[in-house]
Amino acid sequence: MRPILPALLVLGTPALAYPVTVRSCDREVTFEAAPEAAVSNDVNLTEMMLVLGLTDHMIGYTGISGWNKLDAEMRAGVDELPELSEKYPSKEVLLGAGTDFFFAGWNYGMKVGGEVTPETLGAFDIAVYELTESCTHVMDKPKASMEDLYADLLALGTIFGVPERAEELVAGYRAELDAMLADLAPLETAPRVFVYDSGEDSPFTAGRYAMPTALIEAAGGTNVMDDFEKSWATVGWEAVIEADPEVIVIVNYGDVTAEQKRAFMMENPAFADISAVENDRFVTLEYVEATPGPRNIDAVATLAEAFRAE
């Protein structure tokens, strides 16, 4: 696993001339200067801030410990920053902290029609940049791809006046991914893959607009829910059984462990004929690997190895 704060990224970079404008979903947002009181929501978005070396511009983060997603590496990265809210922050929390920038997404700290949105915060001069993967909740967008991650890192680099730092990081990710994939043995056919996030009565999974679709495809597989016109959402078990996935990716977070999720599927007679269950082909991704963020490259490597396992 690569460190959250690579040494090369904490070095100084030339200052960027302001104002700058970036696209955030269906909006264009202009910044007259780099934010100085930024707040990020969720572990993956916060790691994007950390990997770009932006902690000096932050006053805190939200939405991590409420879902038990803070690992040792992440805890060290945010050691000097307060968690302003264990789950989604209220408008009052952000205002009370003196926030001038909120990095969040739809269902990553904001809800469509909720009290915390770009419009409600904009009235108090709090700028918002929305996670690209989540834009499907407010506009039409292409299916998920690795470009979603790269776009967010480059936009953050522009917003905070470190575009060269972001460009170097993204170029490194591209090169690492290309080199890794070039070394992989070809697959005869793309394995059918189902993402099991949570839920027993009905599974919460990744559709065509969620990052795991991009990770699975980069690793050589195909998401059996690729025709599901959603990002992260609930489906029926009948659809999973009918799709007959050959590999099941378990997203590990929260109170139910990955092993408990695997046991639920292995011990349920209704799933006995699913190929992945029959052959015990499960692979675990941590939440921070399965959602858009710096650990996506490691996630592709994990999936690629699992897809080629005997």
Give, region by region, the residue ranges found by the protein language model:
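Structured C-terminal subdomain patch of bacterial secreted/periplasmic proteins
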Residues: K143-L154, T158, V247-E310
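A short, structured surface patch at a secondary-structure boundary
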Residues: S40-A97, F101, W106-M110, V224
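Short helix-initiation/N-cap motifs at beta->coil->alpha
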Residues: S24-D26, L81-E92, V112, S134, ...
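Extracytoplasmic ligand-binding site segments that recognize negatively charged/polar headgroups
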Residues: Y108-P118, I126-A155, T189-M211, E259
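Solvent-exposed loop/turn segments at secondary-structure junctions
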Residues: N44-E47, I64-W67, F101-F102, N107-K111, ...
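Bacterial Sec-exported substrate-binding components of ABC uptake systems
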Residues: P3-L5, G12-M48, T158-Y196, E305-E310
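Short helices/loops that flank or line small-molecule/ion binding pockets
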Residues: K91-F101, E119, V235-D244
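Alpha-helical, coiled-coil/dimerization segments enriched in small aliphatic residues
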Residues: W67, T205-W232
